Structure formats: C-alpha cells, structure tokens
Amino acid sequence: MSSRTVIRGGLVITASDEIHADVLIEDGRVAALAATGTPAAEAFTAENVIDASGKYVIPGGVDGHTHMEMPFGGTYAADTFETGTRAAAWGGTTTIVDFAIQSVGHSLREGLDAWHAKAEGNCAIDYGFHMIVSDVNQETLKEMDLLVEEGVTSFKQFMAYPGVFYSDDGQILRAMQRAAENGGLIMMHAENGIAIDVLVEQALARGETDPRFHGEVRKALLEAEATHRAIRLAQVAGAPLYVVHVSATEAVAELTRARDEGLPVFGETCPQYLFLSTDNLAEPDFEGAKYVCSTPLRPKEHQAALWRGLRTNDLQVVSTDHCPFCFSGQKELGRGDFSRIPNGMPGVENRMDLLHQAVVEGHIGRRRWIEIACATPARMFGLYPKKGTIAPGADADIVVYDPHAEQVISAETHHMNVDYSAYEGRRITGRVETVLSRGEPVVTEREYTGRKGHGAYTPRATCQYLT
C-alpha cells in the first residue's frame, strides 16, 4: 500500500538552491517538488501533511565520521548504535558512516562482520561503514578489492597511535596503491605518532600530567608534517586522499597547496575545532579531560583558518568524529597521566545546530551549511543523490528546521549516552523540529517517534568526486 506525505510551505534548502516549495513523498522517496501556491503544488494530495511554514526544509545530515561502541584505551565509546543513532536523529542527522576496525592479526572481514553484528537491528537511521586498516599485508590488500565491490569503499589509516592502529609509510603506500587500482578512498589520521610518543614520554617525565599537556605534545607542526607526508605518498601512489579531523592552520595550508596543484586531496574538520580551543583543555580540576581528542583542540587563532578553508573549499566536509566517553569512570582513567585519558568527544547530536549557528554568525551561508553537512559527505562517500539532497528519486531523509527557535545546549537535555556536553550552556539559534528517515517520522514536532531497527545498512559507491 502506498504511503504519501506532503511537506507544505517551507523554504527548501539544498547545496545548490533555495526555493519556497512543497515536497511530495511517496513510498519513502521524494516524488516531486513544486513551488508553494502553484497549481502543481496544490495538486499534491497525501494522508500526512506537515506544515513547514516559516521553517527550513533541508536534507537529513550525513555524518561521515562516527565511532559507536569503539574500543579505546581499555574501555568502549559510551554510545551504542542504538543510542548513538537515536541522538543523531534528534540532531537532524539521518545517515552515519561508522568505522569498522581490523585488529592486528585479523582480517578485514572479521572486523566488518563484528561491526555489522553491533549495528544490525539497532539503528534508528541508515548507516554505512568505512574500514580501519591496521594490518597491511597481501591478504588485507586483496580483501580491500572485495570490500569495494560490496560497498565499503573507504579505508582509514593512522599515522598516529603506534602499537594500536599505526601504519608505517610503506604500509600506507601499499594501501594507497591498492586504492588507486580499486577505486577506494584512503582516509588518513595525519599526526606523526612516533614523534608524539617521544614528547608524551618527556612530558610525563617532567611531571606534566594534566589534560592540557595532551594538546601541547600533539603539536600542530606534527599534524602538518604528517598531512604533507600523506599527500605526497598519495601523489606517488596516484591515489586520492581524504584527511580526517583537520585542526591546525599549518595542516590546512598543506591541503590548500595540494589542491592548488590539482591533486585529488580532500579535508574534513569537526565542530570541536571550530567552536572550542585549548582554553577548554586547560579547564581546572581535570575538567579539561572532557575535551581530550586527537587531533587535539588548538589555540583559538587556528579557528579562522578552518572557517576560511570551509569558505574557499579547501576543507569540504564537517563531520563529528563522535566518540564519547563519560567523564565519570572513563575520562577519569587518565587522572595523573593525560596519556591514559580515552581520546574522543560527543557531538553527533550537535553538528547540524552548531553549523546553523555558524550561518547565524556569518561564517558560512545557508547553502554552504547544507553542502558541508549533507551533500558533500554524501558525494564523498558514494551516497548521492540517494542521500544529501531533496530531489525526485532521493530517499526522503528530510528535516524540518526552525531557524528562529533558541536553545541552550546541555547534557541535561541531550540524547547522547554520555554524562557531559562539550558545549554545555552554549546558547544557539535554530533547532530540529521534525525528522523523516526514508519518509518515516523519527522525530515529530520535538517528540521521538523512531524505533531501533528502522535504520538500514547502506552499501556505498566509490567517491563521486573522482568519476
């Protein structure tokens, strides 16, 4: 039986257009759009009518970087796929791409199967997977080809975390060469982990144990050096490169230079680098531990380069790197030794709102908001135009957004499974009102109407900027 919904009277915003239009949804997909008040729009009929007058109608957010239930430092990220995808929906995100992990000594397939088992039947919204490659060998390289064919088309490597996820330059080059052949996209955590480990050891020997030292040892220059090295290795391999969680002015400069040379190099940043700084890491009484993530928060002056990069398209995507650990019992593992603080912050629920606040404050325009949060990540990870836009044939992943509502971000009211908010007390303008995932209401006028198991695994095509 056909199910139809009409969203009437809103300002439809995509990466390329803004138009006052009515949206007809049929069987989980966008069937048609027509300018509000025209005979074509008036002819839309449906059982369900959503009044979006005075509101924005935007594509559901695509968060290309989350870590649900991720093991790290002897504990696990606090959000499960159930709680994390529910929180994402509350924040206007309707698709996540999470990271399945290959453990050293194991196959990619084992890691991917484990993540499918965590997610299947538990997600409120649609999801896909990237693959973390921790152990490059001949078998792993063959498996990369198979995964691309199955719709896992991006592979993350780490220049950081020796002994855990770290790959050396030779392993990175081999994986990049394979990606150049099979169409995959290499995603890079670009920090010089070998040098950082020396600085960590030296800092602890001096008695520098507080959370703020996490930011001091993970130097911007070591992010820039690794970014430069990753770009040149990718150039040698003839492969595209996507650098995750870019935080430093010097790293943006490396990306800008590479793109000016015409290289297929892309960069992502995250809200924490745009809105927070080392001032947070330096908060007293171990409060700074809440803000320990890698790459680390930088001094405030780095924010201008990140905003500029987003405006000039030297940075193309804003994701969250959502990897929450509770302050109580998890972040506290690092009391007396900052290197033992689990690395990661909550944010999957806040991204769309914080980026709307960036529109309010004049950092970016409305269409750029949708571009960096919805359309570009969908294209980058082979999901467009099924995801990331509002157009006939697209999945009806749609958010009715109130641009005038005011809210105060707080752990008291958020839905992430973590005991603090990185943005506690921040007053912002704009709020999600209603969320549809494939036409099904997940949030209805600020009431949760979704269910675990609605979210479907979504295989991906290869990066659409390279075809």
Swiss-Prot record:
EC number: 3.5.2.-
GO terms for MF: hydrolase activity, acting on carbon-nitrogen (but not peptide) bonds, in cyclic amides; metal ion binding
Cofactor detail note: Binds 2 Zn(2+) ions per subunit.
Modified residue annotations for N6-carboxylysine: K156
Chain positions recorded as Zn(2+) 1 binding sites: H65, H67, K156, D321
An example Gene Ontology CC term for this record: cytosol
PTMs per UniProt: Carboxylation allows a single lysine to coordinate two zinc ions.
Cofactor field: Zn(2+)
Keyword annotations: Hydrolase, Metal-binding, Zinc
Source organism superkingdom: Bacteria
Gene3D superfamilies, per database record: Metal-dependent hydrolases (3.20.20.140), Urease, subunit C, domain 1 (2.30.40.10)
InterPro entries (alphabetical): Amidohydro-rel, Hydantoinase/dihydroPyrase, Metal-dep_hydrolase_composite, Metal_Hydrolase, Metallo-dep_Hydrolases_sf
Binding site for substrate: Y161, S294, N343
Record: residues binding Zn(2+) 2: K156, H189, H245
Protein family membership: Belongs to the metallo-dependent hydrolases superfamily. Hydantoinase/dihydropyrimidinase family.
Known partners and oligomeric status: Homotetramer.
Function as written in the Swiss-Prot or TrEMBL entry: Catalyzes the stereospecific hydrolysis of the cyclic amide bond of D-hydantoin derivatives.
Protein name as annotated: D-hydantoinase
Upper lineage: Bacteria, Bacillati, Actinomycetota, Actinomycetes, Kitasatosporales
